[in-house]
Amino acid sequence: MKRKIFLWHQKLEVFLKIEDEEIINRLKNVLRLKEGESVFFLNNFSEEGEYELLDSKKFIFKRKNLKERDLVPQRKINLYVSLIRKENFELILEKGTELGVYLFQPVISQRSSLKIKEIPSRWFKIIGSALEVTNWKHTPEIKEIKTLGEILKENKENFYLAHKEGEKINLKKMPQEINLLIGPEGGFSEEEEKMIREKTKFISLGDFDSRTETACLVFLSLLNFS
């Protein structure tokens, strides 16, 4: 398996000097990279390059080859996720990236269990790490946190809510770009559901019932790989 490391906002020039302490730690203590050995770097500009370590003290690399990552998923999926428990939300970020999500939109709802107002830097690291095991061209964007009311006012087209009482998903009828809303543990409140029904279409997995994060990943798998 290729040894890959994701670099945010760094172009893959012919010579590359790594200064990020976390990445240096991975190179030294996890990958145990020695001078003359190679590693693959990728970034959020769809680039992937193979690099040889020239200097193990200053962590200077020379590029051996460069390519553009060109794999695109079957559908463009914008995932609107209620702020559920931290570990479950981060699981959706990780696996959603691996499954080809185009955009993540965190949503504050009445039953949100994760109480934050700003995007943690850790979320970007999770996405970067997830991309290391894929060949996707696109790096998912994380939008600023919004309330459910703000989201619904945007009047998105092809907006769907994953809901156990919804119509069973028919993949042949699903559009190429999808806005998929995932509720919190316990679901949305009655008041919220009433607002959502006016703006979205409810879809389900039929008799399949599971945790929020599991249902979300099943939907993504079906939409992009069926």
Regions inferred by a protein language model and the residue ranges of each:
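Fold-independent oxyanion-binding glycine-rich loops
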Residues: 10, 20-21, 44, 83, ...
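RNA substrate-binding interface of SAM-dependent RNA methyltransferases
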Residues: 70-158
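Structured adenosyl-cofactor binding patch, chiefly the S-adenosyl-L-methionine
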Residues: 190-226
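Short, Lys/Arg-enriched, disordered terminal segments
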Residues: 1-15, 154-156, 170-176, 198, ...
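Active-site/ligand-binding-proximal alpha/beta "capping" segment
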Residues: 159-194, 200-205
